[in-house]
């Protein structure tokens, strides 16, 4: 800094004769108090003059002494008082909307992410319908023949002739019902039941507490598929004019866009005089995003500006919806067929009747009880599925708050 405009401290020059007092100058600015000077030598007492008023002396001529050495630099002055804010200037006419920049290059496809952890076992599927009735078992073995009856004693022959042959006797009373037979063999395993309906998607879970440490930024995933075009929204109201942004990076030349429709010519505004600089206002609220306009013609390549500040990382997203239940496991193999039951106990022999005609085949017996369920399948669980496509990019973040104004600089000389 150049402090030559500040008053310099007195230097130790040669003491010349005292000159006449000069004319009073204009009052200068109040300077800082300089260092105390060295005490001068005491003067010698001159001879006493004659009493009485003497003639007025002539004005002496001052002799210019040699220039003293350069003094030490003084301390910097205090900063001046801040002036009152000026009146706000009139808003200028809005400038024309610049041409839309060319799209950037497509990002590289990121490396596939690491294999996910093994998922939890799926829930047990619904019980399938009952299988068809098994086929009839083999016919039973014929019972053992009963013991031969004892012969009665021969009666005495009567004196008369032999009578006619008697009529056939009534059939004997049926014997008591025998004990129930042994249970039949286990039936065959029923057919595989149809797959159950997919479960209803659960409601999205509440976001968990953000207590964990911020995770590392993962590698970029593959580009997501293009979403469906949304309907044209209503035009939003014009937001307040924001501060001018930094110059964007130089884009690459793309294909010529469709010419935009010419808007109505507005009335020319009056040119206002330059107003004094006012205080920075508070940040305005972001306006509603209007519909995307038609792509205008490509403008000339602009000068590449400095890179903007890096934005803050986004907040973690909400937890996704719960996935659908997994498919039921494969049906296990059929269980082993049980051993054949023991033959029943022979019934008590009844009275021997006459041999009747051969009867018709009997009805098929009732099906045996259902066999126990087979062992669950022992197949290995399938591998985890591939990672899904990358989601659509989120909306652009809002501009950050404007920083506080800097300190006022020291006024130069």
Curated annotation (Swiss-Prot):
Record field: compositional bias (Low complexity): 21-48, 117-138, 183-204, 237-247, 291-307, 342-361, 401-413
Gene Ontology MF term list: extracellular matrix structural constituent conferring tensile strength
Listed InterPro entries: Collagen (IPR008160), Collagen_superfamily (IPR050149)
Skewed-composition ranges (Gly residues): 49-65, 227-236, 269-278
Renumbered residue ranges of the record's region Disordered: 1-413
Subcellular localization: Secreted; Secreted, Extracellular space; Secreted, Extracellular space, Extracellular matrix
Main location: secreted
Glycosylation site positions: 82
GO biological process, one term: extracellular matrix organization
Post-translational modification: Prolines at the third position of the tripeptide repeating unit (G-X-Y) are hydroxylated in some or all of the chains.
Regions annotated as coiled coil: none
CC terms in the record's Gene Ontology section: extracellular matrix; extracellular space
Modified residues (5-hydroxylysine): 82
Keywords: Extinct organism protein, Extracellular matrix, Glycoprotein, Hydroxylation, Secreted
Tissue: Expressed in bones.
Modified residues (4-hydroxyproline): 7, 10, 21, 27, 313, 316
Subunit and partners: Trimers of one alpha 2(I) and two alpha 1(I) chains. Interacts (via C-terminus) with TMEM131 (via PapD-L domain); the interaction is direct and is involved in assembly and TRAPPIII ER-to-Golgi transport complex-dependent secretion of collagen.
Protein role: Type I collagen is a member of group I collagen (fibrillar forming collagen).
Additional record remark: These protein fragments were extracted from an ancient phalanx bone collected at Arroyo Del Moro in Argentina.
Family statement drawn from the similarity comment of this UniProt entry: Belongs to the fibrillar collagen family.
Protein known as: Collagen alpha-2(I) chain
Organism: Scelidotherium sp. (strain SLP-2019)
């Amino acid at each position: 800094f150049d402090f030559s405009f500040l008053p310099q401290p007195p230097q130790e020059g040669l003491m010349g004769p005292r000159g006449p007092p000069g004319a009073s100058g204009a009052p200068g600015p109040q300077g800082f108090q300089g260092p105390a000077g060295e005490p001068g030598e005491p003067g010698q007492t001159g001879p006493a003059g004659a009493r009485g008023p003497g003639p007025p002396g002539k004005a002496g001529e001052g002799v210019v002494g040699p220039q003293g050495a350069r003094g030490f630099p003084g301390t910097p002055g205090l900063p001046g008082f801040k002036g009152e804010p000026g009146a706000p200037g009139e808003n200028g006419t809005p400038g024309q909307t610049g041409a839309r920049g060319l799209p950037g290059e497509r990002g590289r496809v990121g490396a596939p992410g690491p294999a996910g952890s093994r998922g939890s076992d799926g829930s047990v599927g619904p019980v399938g319908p009952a299988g068809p009735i098994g086929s009839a078992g083999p016919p039973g073995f014929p019972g053992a023949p009963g013991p031969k009856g004892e012969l009665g004693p021969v009666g005495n022959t009567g004196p008369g002739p032999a009578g006619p042959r008697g009529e056939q006797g009534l059939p004997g009373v049926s014997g008591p019902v025998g004990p129930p037979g042994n249970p039949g063999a286990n039936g065959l395993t029923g057919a595989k039941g149809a797959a159950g309906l997919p479960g209803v998607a659960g409601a999205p879970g509440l976001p968990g507490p953000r207590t964990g440490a911020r995770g590392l930024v993962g590698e970029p995933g593959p580009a997501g598929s293009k979403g469906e075009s949304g309907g044209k929204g209503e035009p939003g109201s014009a937001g307040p004019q924001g501060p001018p942004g930094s110059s964007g990076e130089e884009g690459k030349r793309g294909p010529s866009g469709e010419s935009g429709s010419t808007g109505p010519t507005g009335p020319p505004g009056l040119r206002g005089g330059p107003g004094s600089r006012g205080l920075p206002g508070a940040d305005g609220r972001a306006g509603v995003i209007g519909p995307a306009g038609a792509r205008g013609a490509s403008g000339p390549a602009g000068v590449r500006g400095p890179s903007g500040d890096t934005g803050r990382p986004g907040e973690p997203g909400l937890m996704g919806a719960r996935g659908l239940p997994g498919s039921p496991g494969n049906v296990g193999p059929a269980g082993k067929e049980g051993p054949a039951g023991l033959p029943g106990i022979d019934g008590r022999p009844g009275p021997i009747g006459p041999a009747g005609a051969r009867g018709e085949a009997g009805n098929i017996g009732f099906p045996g009880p259902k066999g126990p369920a087979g062992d669950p399948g022992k197949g290995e669980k399938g591998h985890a599925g591939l990672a899904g496509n990358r989601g659509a990019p989120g909306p652009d973040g809002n501009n950050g708050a404007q920083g506080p104004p800097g300190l006022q600089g020291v006024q130069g000389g």
